[in-house]
Each structure stands twice: as C-alpha cells, then as structure tokens.
From Swiss-Prot:
CDD domains: ThyX. The keyword Kinase does not apply. One of its GO terms (molecular function) is thymidylate synthase (FAD) activity. Transmembrane segments: none annotated. It comes from Chlamydia pneumoniae (Chlamydophila pneumoniae). This is UPF0159 protein CPn_0746/CP_1126/CPj0746/CpB0774. Belongs to the UPF0159 family. It comes from the Bacteria.
Length: 531
C-alpha cells in the first residue's frame, strides 16, 4: 500500500503495545487509555500529519524534557490534566461541540420511575439506553414491606399523600393478586403440548401474563436503566434534566453530573451550575417553555376531543413516491435530483413500479434495509394509545416524537383476553380508583399527578418519520413476539400509509398482520438446544 510508513524504536514499540491493538496495520484500536485522553488524541488527529500511534507517543507518552517514552506502569495523571486543558480550550473558547463526541461513559440509573425513564430516553442522538422490562420481569416485590414505586417529595408533603400511597398500593395489590389467577387461566386456555419444551412454554406464558397485567402498574413504578453515551449526549441530557419541572428529574440530573464528573469531567463540565453555558441554557429552556405553553393554552376548538384509540395519518407528500424513485436512481446517475424527480413523474406507471420493485425484490428478511432513497418521503401521524405501548415505541430514535402529559382523560386499554372473566372486575376497579385519585391531584399538581396514572391509560403523541425508518419500525414491531397493543399500532401505521398511496405497500413486505396467542413461543423454542 502507498502511505507514509512509521518507524518506531524497540522501546517505543513496547510502550505502544500497551495502548494499541497492533503496531503495523492501517486499522487498529485503542486500549487502556482514559476517555479524556482518547478524545483529545482523536481531536488532535484531525489537524496533524502524524499517524495516530506517532501522535500518541508525541502528545501523551513521551517525556517532554528528555523525550523518553513510558513503561508498562505509565501514570496518566499528567496526561489526563493535559487532555482536560485541551478540552476546556476547544469547547469553551471555540465552541467545537463535536469533540465532545470522542469519549463517553456508561452510567447506571436505578430506582427511577417509569415516568422519568421516558424523559431520559427522549434523548436520541449519541446515547443508547436499556431498561428493565415490564414484559419479562415481575414487579410484585416489596422492600421493607413497601412496593417499589416513586414517592414524589411534593406529593408526600401535600394533602394528597395518603390518597396517592393508598391508590398505588391498591394497584400493586391488584397486579400481584392477578399474576397467579391469569397464569392459571392461560394454562387452561393454552395447554402445553408434548412437543413444546417446558422452559419455552414457561417463558412465553409468563410474557403473556405480564402483557395482560402490566397496564395496572402506575407511572411511579420504579425501574432500572443502563446508558452508554458520548460526552455531548450527557451534557445535553443533564441540561435538560436540571431544568425539568419534576423534582425527580432534577435530582437525576444533579446526581448524573456528580458521577460523570468522576469519569469524564472534561466532557460534562459545561453542565455545572456555575458555568456560564449552563446558566444561558437554563434561561433559554425556561423562556421557551413558558411562551409555547401560554400560546397552547390560548387555543380554542369547537369540536369535541376524540378519546378513541387511533392511528391517524395527518400529512404526507403527494409527490413522495416520485421522490423515492428518484432517490433510488440518484447514486447511479449523473443527473440532478430535480431532473430525476421530473423524469419519474413523466414515465409510464409500469416503469415507475419497476423502479420501486427493484429496490425490494432482493429483500429476504426485515434486516435487509431498503436503499436510502426511501428516506425522501416523510409522514406525520397522530397516535392515541396506551402508555405501555408508547413506552415500547418511544425508544425508536430515527424520527421525531412528541407526547402530551400523561393523564386519565382518554380512557384506558383493557386486555381483551380478560374480558368476561372473573379477573375483569378487579382490574377495572383498580383503573377507576386510579382515575379518581388522579382527578383529585391534577387540579393542584398537573405534572406530579402523572405518577398516579397506570400504564393502561391512553396517551396522545405524534410521529414524524421518513418511510425508511417507518419500514424498520413497523416490520419489527408487528412481529408475533411483540405486545399486541404496539403490534396494532405498527400495522395501523402501515394501513394509513397504504391508504394514502397503495404503491407504498411494496416496502412493508415483512409486516406481520397475524393474530398470535402465545406470541413468544416460537422464538423461545428456537432458543432450545436441539437433540
């Protein structure tokens, strides 16, 4: 290969071997380096003629006085400070925010309400969250005699304390009591056959039970989350949390900053309260919210608000299908996008179909993604569905989602499997009690009242999404192992798009419209070892 060959002394090679995965290839990874050093190193890399190994030696591994290099027990304390000074200079003085993406950290957040978890997971770019699942883990445990739900300090010092605690306990009591009842009911309804492994049957049955009763869990229910994020992600998230109206989220912002300052201080220092960037950001967020909230409250409507669960296409592009076809052709053409769109508009219908079909004909499963040209069209949807389904769909990040406050105003989703069974009465009693308590609290504490709302209650939110991201979401979330509620939303999204223009159906060939009883059974059976 042509390129500048780097030559290192034996001692330099010995030193470098502790910090890079190889000494000769053009492709190598870094190891055993602090995050701030790795980030500063890559940032300097973009403005240097040196290779990364030589730059690492020059900037961080060589003694500035005599040029000697490190040994295996090298102490990075000086280099960490040097890198930190570099970050302060670049971030603060030049505002080059992208260098904050060159290092990151893992952060665990435990005993967080599922209401707060959604705010944390709203942060889309640069971070990856994982959350304890309400579909596979029972939430009936007690610690020191108390169920695991968040006790908001404002509610705990208000006149609603006893009402809130009593209703949450009632919801958890109902949830716990229904577990064995629903399990026994499903064991009779879906008996295990001789060919089904016991462990696969037990896992799929448990998922079915939890799918039915998770709607009883209030938004105050405690969960655990794990995040990996780059420095820019953490800084933006902390800014958001520190300015939130809920005390829980402000506390999480402060505690996250404290812990991240121990591992990636240079990446998050601008979120410290005394920093001028932080003060300006807080003022901006506060003013923005106050202005938009005031304008929204002035809006009046003559029609009654619909509270029926629905998926509604609000807007789409009538010329979108031509833009998609042009987008498919563009990488293989030398003409402008405008020329190609005009070309596709004027061609015979069968020729347009041929272009569209050629982009999907080779797809053998949902992981075979369509070309990026499918991103040339976007849709907007208004969705009203249960909070549990929202929690599952909200984790998709290649789209725009906004939600309204969680409330009991739009009714709740009752699991159809429990209709006309002995369990229906206790489930509905719990829902009604939660509704009554919410209506009392919301008059004085509209945001804190959300903690009271069970997951079965409906919430309104919108999707603004390109067709390629929609393809991924709908083909994934319609699979048999998914929860029936979000499967219904996924198929509803596709139906709305196909109604808008039937030609889009080509791109959703792996959407599963089937009704499945024990949805996870086939997947669990695939996990069983063959004999």
């Amino acid at each position: 290969m042509l390129g500048k060959e780097e030559e290192f002394t034996c001692k330099q090679k010995q030193c470098l071997s502790h910090f890079v995965t190889n000494l000769t290839s053009d492709v190598f990874a870094l190891k055993n380096l602090p995050e701030v050093v790795k980030g500063a190193l890559f940032s300097k890399y973009s403005r240097s003629v040196l290779g990364l190994r030589a730059l690492l030696l020059k900037e961080f591994l060589s003694n500035e006085e005599d040029g000697d290099v490190c040994d295996e027990a090298y102490d990075f304390e000086t280099d960490v400070q040097k890198a930190a000074d570099f970050y302060q200079r670049v971030l603060d003085n030049f505002g080059d925010d992208s260098v904050g993406e060159l290092g990151g950290a893992h952060l665990a957040m435990e005993n967080v309400s599922i209401l707060a978890a959604k705010v944390l997971e709203d942060a889309r770019i640069g971070g990856s969250p994982l959350e304890k699942s309400t579909r596979y883990v029972y939430f009936d445990q007690k610690v020191r005699g108390e169920y695991l739900y968040y006790r908001d300090p404002i509610l705990m010092t208000s006149a609603f304390k006893d009402m809130f605690l009593g209703t949450c306990d009632f919801l958890f009591d109902t949830y716990s009591a229904l577990i064995p009842q629903v399990r026994a009911y499903f064991e009779k309804l879906y008996p295990k056959d001789s060919k089904t492994p016991a462990s696969a049957y037990a896992t799929s049955l448990r998922a079915k039970v939890l799918d039915c009763i998770r709607g009883l869990l209030p938004a105050a229910t405690l969960t655990n989350l794990g995040f990996f994020g780059n420095g820019r992600f953490w800084q933006n998230l902390i800014h958001k949390l520190q300015g939130h109206n809920l005390a829980e989220l402000r506390r999480l912002g402060d505690e996250s900053l404290t812990e991240l300052m121990k591992v990636i201080p240079s990446f998050v220092s601008r979120a410290e309260p005394h920093h001028h960037h932080h003060q300006a950001m807080m003022q901006y967020r506060r003013a923005l919210k106050e202005q938009l909230k005031g304008l929204a409250e002035q809006a009046t409507f003559s029609e009654e608000m619909s509270s029926s669960p629905s998926v509604q296409l609000v807007y789409g592009d009538p010329d979108g299908i031509y833009k998609v076809a042009a987008g498919f052709l563009f990488p293989y053409s030398n003409r402008s996008l405008t020329d190609l769109i005009d070309y596709c508009k004027k061609m015979p219908h069968e020729d347009l179909v041929q272009i569209l079909e050629s982009s999907v004909s080779a797809r053998e499963n949902r992981r075979h993604k369509s070309p990026r040209g499918l991103e040339c069209v976007e849709f907007g949807f208004d969705i009203l569905a249960d909070f549990g389904a929202y929690r599952d769909l909200q984790r998709h990040r290649t789209l725009t989602q906004e939600r309204q406050l969680l409330s009991t105003h739009h009714g709740y989703n009752f699991p159809v499997e429990l209709l006309d069974t002995p369990m229906e009465k206790s489930y509905r009693e719990a829902m009604e009690r939660a509704n009554e308590t919410y209506n009392e609290i919301v008059q004085e504490f509209p945001e804190e009242a959300q903690y009271m709302v069970p997951m079965a209650y409906n919430i309104r939110w919108f999707f603004h999404v390109n067709a390629r991201a929609l393809q991924w979401i709908c083909e994934l979330r319609s699979q048999p192992q998914g929860h029936q509620n979000y499967r219904t939303i996924a198929t509803g999204l596709v139906r709305e798009v196909v109604k808008f223009n039937p030609m889009y159906e080509l791109f959703f060939k792996f959407v599963d419209y089937s009704d499945i009883d024990l949805g996870r059974l086939n997947q669990e059976m695939r996990k069983e070892p063959t004999t």
